[in-house]
Every structure is written in structure tokens, then in C-alpha cells.
Amino acid sequence: MNVLIPSQLRDYTGGRAHVEARGGTLAELLADLERRHPGIRFRMIDEQDAIRRHIKIFVNQQPTRDLGTALAANDEVVIVGALSGG
């Protein structure tokens, strides 16, 4: 399925905004992203296996924080990272 990667994580994807990944759940998709792009998962998931507070994930335009969210092959996943500034 198509995954949109936020600009602050594109160093892990060779600069690509759109990447392919597979998984029956959001957790499996993130594990596949990690396999394809080592180091990216830790930037999104904390030590307690929860989505980091500054990361938002949308599946077919619906926000989710549940790693058990079921996915289908034609779903679109958008990962958004909050930007900070001062």
C-alpha cells in the first residue's frame, strides 16, 4: 500500500515522500517500513510500543493511534509529524 512519509523522516527513505509497505495491521505496516527503511520505526514508536505524541497517522483520511488498526492492500496511510518552532 502507499504510505506518505513526512519531510522530517525522509532521510530514512532516501528522500522519497511516497513509499510502499505491506501489513495486515498498522503495527505490521510499521514493521515492514522498518525492514525496508531501518531506523524509521523508532522515530514514530516509543519504548512502550505506542505512537509518539508528535506523530499522527491517518488511514484513509481517518486518524488512528491504534497499532492494531486493520489495513487492506488498497488503503492509503499518511504519517504526519508535528513541527516545532520558536
Report the location of each language-model feature:
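Ubiquitin-like/PB1-type beta-grasp interaction modules and other compact soluble beta-rich domains
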Residues: 1-85
